[in-house]
């Protein structure tokens, strides 16, 4: 989604005044004035959400639904379209995906109440209950269960301070971090917000930083640090914010802007988020958008999850676990102690195989407590969410008790903290609530509380009595049907119900006379094939049934509200338990993956070493295994930023298709996995943490920004040379290939020298400029490795093995031949190459080549009569005599030619 096109509705739209409008249209226009100008208004009318005026025009086009007219206003026809309320979420999902925002105007009373309040012409009261935006979704039908849905706010103060605050409304997660200007793109790419709030003056810049996010510009006043601090204190009911962190002014501004926007989206209700967690600057490995895309961490270049690194290692069994794993890959750590804590948790589950399998079986039953809790807190939850919470916390307690029974060893920090969050023995109120939810809610409750029928029998005596009265009345209806049928002698008589007539007697048209003459039956409706009647008894019975049903439903809704309030009181403990379950899922799943893929625990340090023995590319290895194309060839990689244990800059040469790019990417992914706190696909690994990861591998035109492929490549290279530090890790592939040979070689040469002397970082530099390999002789911390190939019976065989030293050939012409270049072109290329290699000076050699000397196409080979006859012979079908005759015949043919 392009950011500049994510405002499909202008922010300066205007609508007609309500003067002269009908009462209903007057109400619509009043609500329309309250809603954000850049949002569509879904106006509830019975079983439909209707849209009017410009909203209808835009929505009908986006949803491909009919656009009609509904009367006139101020002399102009009123455009209208609508969607059924029962399927509204599907339409909402399409609008949100297209970048729209939608204000929802709900009916706040039923028509009966409206009539009782203001007579037959009274308009049902309506109010905007929420504004649905890409970053404020909570419904399962609108979200991918395995993907976080974040909304972020970027605050940039005039002092130069900047900060990002972000939240996932669907889980309650809320964080903030200071951010340096040069890291903005990397930070935004890491969180991948569905929606980004920015100050109006920074909209254009933000559009470049977050091309896939919906941008929401806000007035400067929304980013005021002082008012934000007051808002934060009120929101979390504290006197000082130091309990949550020592926030900078920029952090306060970002937090406040985000809270204010979320409150507006809830029609003024406060956001239901956990207290903000502060993330220190530099706490995560910085990965810029280009690097993130080229390494295909969470999505491939085509946008698919399949084929990404996340897809290759994900063995999680819960949606919260999948989201947490994706977050870890998106934001690897730089703190060795925190990385080791994650690795300790994986190691613990790696050793406890039986317990791990039992845990994973239990987790499959746990559901998504994080999102269920958030929906309940926001007033969007239902009975199923209550049941889901109870099930998750019950499973959590069982998991905790079983893991605590382990006698293998003491659990590491992350595991012990999770066990503490799941054990209910020291949380009596939460334990009591879970037990109450289990008793109160039926096994398969409805989605919405208003549907009723979710409170279990025996939980509330008065509710049971009302249900019995309601059900008994329904049995009386069945008895009345039989009585009426016998009284009038019409066995086909039926008692039915609809929302217009209530209960009524229905007979076919030919039996109508039998009831018309009976005073008990009051004629109500004649249809083509049936006649309908009512009776005094049915009317009285319906009133009793309706009264009992209404009272029972009201009692259930009250019970739901009470249980929801109790859940809200325990929200912090429930969140802690839900996070623990997700933590266990990630650790156990990574242990499972490590076992399946023979991954090793990396040894982490603060130095600058990068020693990999038998490293493999996790995605390519998995693809080979699935396709049955053999085993991946492992390779070592040794780098040292200090240049002591190994070279810090290594040139990688070798034939096309030999695996240079794969080798580069696999080492970048190994570093990233290690810093994410995962085992790595290698026999052994010793890794010093990096502060930034850069990948200049592959490029494409960026026509929207007026950039050619070469320009895009140079911009990425410039960013690396300007920003990489001695602690960074860089992979570069074919720098300078998009321009003239000498220009490209010169650029690549200068970039290599700069990486070595100025940046001083660990770097892998793949190139076909063999002249570059001479730098290893001149630069003290530069070296050469190459991908090996062998010629066998005229064919080139790629070994995919990395060895020391530089390659002497690229075999590009051989690869071109394999790709299907015409033979004449291949031969011409071979001739040109031979001349160039012999003369050693490309410009001079080319001028000496006879133009088009070999460009005349060779004649197609003529197949002789002998060859044709030989092709027709089946030697196994010939007798010795027949074979001899054929031989004489072939010899005779040769004499003719």
UniProtKB/Swiss-Prot annotation:
Listed CDD domains: ABC_MutS1
Keywords: ATP-binding, DNA damage, DNA repair, DNA-binding, Nucleotide-binding
Gene Ontology process terms (BP): mismatch repair
SUPFAM superfamilies: DNA repair protein MutS, domain I, DNA repair protein MutS, domain II, DNA repair protein MutS, domain III, P-loop containing nucleoside triphosphate hydrolases
GO molecular function: ATP binding; ATP-dependent DNA damage sensor activity; damaged DNA binding; mismatched DNA binding
Cellular component GO terms held in the UniProt record: cytosol
UniProt xrefs under InterPro entries: DNA_mismatch_repair_MutS (IPR005748), DNA_mismatch_repair_MutS-lik_N (IPR007695), DNA_mismatch_repair_MutS/MSH (IPR017261), DNA_mismatch_repair_MutS_C (IPR000432), DNA_mismatch_repair_MutS_clamp (IPR007861), DNA_mismatch_repair_MutS_core (IPR007696), DNA_mismatch_repair_MutS_N (IPR016151), DNA_mismatch_repair_MutS_sf (IPR036187)
Entry similarity comment: Belongs to the DNA mismatch repair MutS family.
Function per UniProt: This protein is involved in the repair of mismatches in DNA. It is possible that it carries out the mismatch recognition step. This protein has a weak ATPase activity.
HAMAP family: MutS (MF_00096)
Cross-referenced NCBIfam families: mutS1, PRK05399.1
This protein's name: DNA mismatch repair protein MutS
Organism expressing this protein natively: Maricaulis maris (strain MCS10) (Caulobacter maris)
Lineage: Bacteria, Pseudomonadati, Pseudomonadota, Alphaproteobacteria, Maricaulales
Gene: mutS
């Amino acid at each position: 989604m392009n950011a500049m096109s994510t405002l499909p509705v202008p922010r300066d739209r205007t609508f007609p005044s309500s003067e002269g409008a009908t009462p209903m249209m007057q109400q619509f226009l009043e609500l329309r004035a309250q809603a954000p100008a850049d949002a569509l208004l879904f106006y509830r009318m019975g079983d439909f959400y209707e849209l009017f005026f410009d909203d209808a025009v835009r929505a009908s086009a986006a949803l491909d639904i009919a656009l009609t007219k509904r009367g006139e206003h101020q002399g102009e026809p009123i455009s209208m379209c609508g969607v059924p309320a029962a399927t509204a979420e599907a339409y909402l999902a399409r609008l949100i995906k297209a970048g729209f925002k939608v204000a929802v105007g709900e009916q706040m009373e039923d028509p009966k109440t409206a009539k009782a309040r203001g007579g037959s012409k009274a308009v049902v009261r309506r109010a905007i209950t929420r504004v649905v935006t890409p970053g404020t979704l909570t419904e399962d039908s609108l979200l991918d269960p395995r993907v976080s849905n974040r909304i972020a706010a970027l605050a940039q103060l005039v002092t130069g301070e900047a900060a990002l605050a972000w939240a996932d409304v669907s889980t309650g997660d809320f964080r903030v971090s200071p951010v340096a200007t040069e890291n903005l793109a990397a930070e935004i790419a890491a969180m991948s917000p569905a929606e980004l709030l920015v100050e109006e003056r920074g909209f254009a810049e933000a559009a470049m930083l977050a091309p896939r996010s919906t941008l929401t510009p806000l007035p400067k006043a929304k980013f005021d640090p002082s008012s934000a601090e007051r808002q934060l204190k009120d929101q979390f009911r504290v006197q000082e914010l130091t309990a949550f962190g020592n926030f900078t002014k920029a952090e306060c501004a970002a937090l406040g802007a985000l809270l204010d926007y979320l409150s507006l989206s809830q029609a003024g209700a406060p956001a239901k988020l956990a207290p903000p967690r502060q993330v220190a600057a530099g706490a995560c490995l910085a990965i810029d958008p280009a690097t993130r895309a080229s390494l295909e961490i969470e999505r491939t270049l085509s946008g698919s999850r399949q084929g990404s690194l996340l897809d290759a290692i994900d063995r999680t069994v819960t949606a919260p676990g999948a989201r947490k794993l994706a977050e870890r890959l998106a934001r690897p750590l730089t703190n060795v102690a925190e990385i080791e804590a994650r690795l300790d948790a994986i190691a613990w589950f790696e050793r406890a195989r039986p317990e791990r399998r039992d845990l994973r079986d239990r987790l499959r039953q746990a559901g998504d407590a994080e999102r269920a809790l958030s929906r309940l807190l926001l007033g969007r939850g239902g009975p199923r969410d209550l049941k889901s919470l109870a099930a998750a916390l019950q499973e959590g307690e069982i998991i905790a008790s079983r893991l605590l029974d382990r006698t293998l060893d003491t659990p590491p920090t992350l595991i012990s903290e999770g066990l503490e969050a799941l054990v209910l023995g020291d949380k009596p109120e939460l334990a009591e609530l879970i037990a109450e939810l289990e008793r109160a809610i039926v096994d398969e409750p409805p989605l919405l509380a208003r549907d009723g029928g979710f409170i279990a029998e025996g939980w509330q005596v008065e509710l049971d009595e009302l249900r019995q009265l309601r059900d008994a009345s329904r049995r009386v209806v069945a008895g009345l049907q039989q009585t009426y049928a016998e009284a009038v002698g019409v066995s086909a008589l039926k008692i039915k119900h609809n929302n217009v007539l209530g209960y009524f007697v229905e007979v076919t048209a030919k039996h109508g006379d039998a009831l018309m003459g009976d005073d008990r039956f009051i004629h109500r409706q004649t249809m083509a094939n049936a006649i309908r009647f009512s009776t005094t008894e049915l009317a009285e019975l319906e009133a009793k049934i309706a009264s009992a049903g209404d009272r029972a439903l009201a009692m259930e809704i009250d019970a739901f509200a009470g249980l929801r309030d109790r859940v809200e009181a325990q929200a912090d403990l429930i969140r802690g338990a839900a996070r623990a379950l997700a933590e266990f899922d990630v650790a156990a799943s990574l242990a499972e993956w490590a076992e399946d893929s023979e991954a090793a625990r990396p040894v982490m340090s603060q130095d600058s070493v990068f020693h990999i023995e038998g490293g493999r590319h996790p995605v390519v290895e998995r693809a080979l295994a699935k396709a049955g194309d053999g085993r991946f060839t492992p390779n070592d990689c040794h780098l040292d930023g200090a240049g002591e244990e190994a070279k810090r800059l290594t040139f990688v040469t070798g034939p096309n298709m030999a695996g240079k790019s794969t080798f580069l990417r696999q080492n970048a992914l190994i570093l990233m996995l290690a810093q994410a706190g995962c085992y790595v696909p290698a026999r052994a690994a010793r890794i010093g943490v990096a502060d930034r990861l850069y990948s200049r591998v592959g490029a494409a035109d960026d026509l929207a920004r007026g950039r050619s492929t070469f320009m895009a490549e140079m911009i990425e290279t410039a960013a690396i040379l300007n920003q990489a530090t001695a602690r960074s890790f860089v992979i570069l592939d074919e720098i300078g290939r998009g321009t003239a040979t000498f220009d490209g070689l010169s650029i690549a040469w200068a970039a290599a020298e700069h990486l070595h002397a100025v940046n001083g970082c660990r770097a892998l530099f793949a190139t076909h400029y063999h002249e570059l390999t001479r730098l290893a002789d001149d630069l003290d911390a530069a070296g050469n490795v190459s991908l090996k190939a062998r010629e066998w019976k005229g064919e080139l065989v790629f070994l995919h093995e990395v060895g020391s030293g530089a390659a002497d050939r690229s075999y590009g012409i051989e690869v071109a031949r394999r790709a299907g270049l015409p033979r004449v072109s291949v031969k011409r290329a071979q001739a040109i190459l031979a001349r160039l290699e012999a003369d050693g000076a490309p410009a001079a050699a080319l001028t000496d080549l006879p133009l088009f000397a070999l460009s005349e196409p060779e004649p197609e080979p003529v197949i002789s009569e002998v060859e044709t006859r030989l092709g027709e012979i089946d030697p196994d079908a010939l007798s010795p005599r027949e074979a001899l005759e054929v031989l004489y015949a072939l010899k005779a043919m040769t004499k003719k030619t």
